[in-house]
Design a protein with these regions (language model features):
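Conserved glycine-rich Rossmann-like NAD(P)H-binding loop of the short-chain dehydrogenase/reductase
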Residues: 28-45
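Residue(s) in the substrate-gating loop at a strand-loop-helix junction
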Residues: 150
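The beta1-alpha1 cofactor-binding region of Rossmann-like NAD(H)/NADP(H)-dependent oxidoreductases
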Residues: 39-40, 58-71, 105
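Active-site loop immediately N-terminal to the catalytic Tyr-X3-Lys motif
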Residues: 97, 155-161
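Substrate-binding pocket helix/loop in short-chain dehydrogenase/reductase
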Residues: 95-109
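Active-site helix of classical SDR
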Residues: 123, 166
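Canonical Rossmann dinucleotide-binding motif of NAD(H)/NADP(H)-dependent dehydrogenases/reductases
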Residues: 3-33
Length: 171
């Protein structure tokens, strides 16, 4: 897909891999909507890339209403969505059984919620928007969705059970 003139939603787009993706898409002539919880970093990216090319939306990817509001902001600002890159993610190291007892289930649940459920929440809403516009190229595609995984999906590391499981779910 030619990125020039296309609109992308990038989750976790204010830092790390998501920030690099945001810069790359904007550098290729795309418009980027950053979904992130870090408002200062998100606004800094808008200042760097320019408000004509970039929009920040404070979105909790796990929360359906928050994600819907972000999608609505993207469509309102740029008309549609052609690309969705899901980079939002967290990792909390904890052993299955540590000195203080078994792996805390609230930690497990939060990592799975953000990394796996949050990814699906945003991609399904982006897909709904993509399905409404005309194909963007000769093969009939209406958009592209990229979900960021990790080698941890295949090679678990000590203390990374939840992270590995969440990335395995993405794969």
């Amino acid at each position: 897909m030619d990125i020039n003139g296309k609109v992308a939603v990038v989750t976790g787009g204010a830092s790390g891999i998501g920030q690099a993706v945001t810069r790359r898409i904007a550098g290729a002539g795309g418009k980027v909507v950053i979904f992130d919880l870090n408002e200062d970093a998100g606004q800094a990216m808008v200042a760097e890339l320019g408000a004509d090319n970039c929009l920040y939306a404070k979105v909790n990817v796990v929360d359906e209403d928050s994600a819907k509001a972000g999608i609505e902001a993207a469509v309102s600002a740029f008309g549609t969505i052609h690309i969705n890159v899901n980079c939002a993610g967290i990792g909390n190291a904890a052993k299955t059984l540590g000195r203080d007892g078994p792996f805390p289930m609230d930690v497990w649940s939060k990592v799975i919620a953000v990394n796996l459920t949050g990814t699906f929440n945003v991609l399904r809403l982006c897909a709904e928007v993509m399905a409404k516009h005309d194909p963007v190229n000769d093969d009939g595609s209406r958009g592209v969705i990229i979900n960021t995984a990790s080698v941890a999906a295949y090679e678990g590391q000590m203390g990374q059970a939840a992270y590995s499981a969440s990335k395995g779910g993405i794969v």
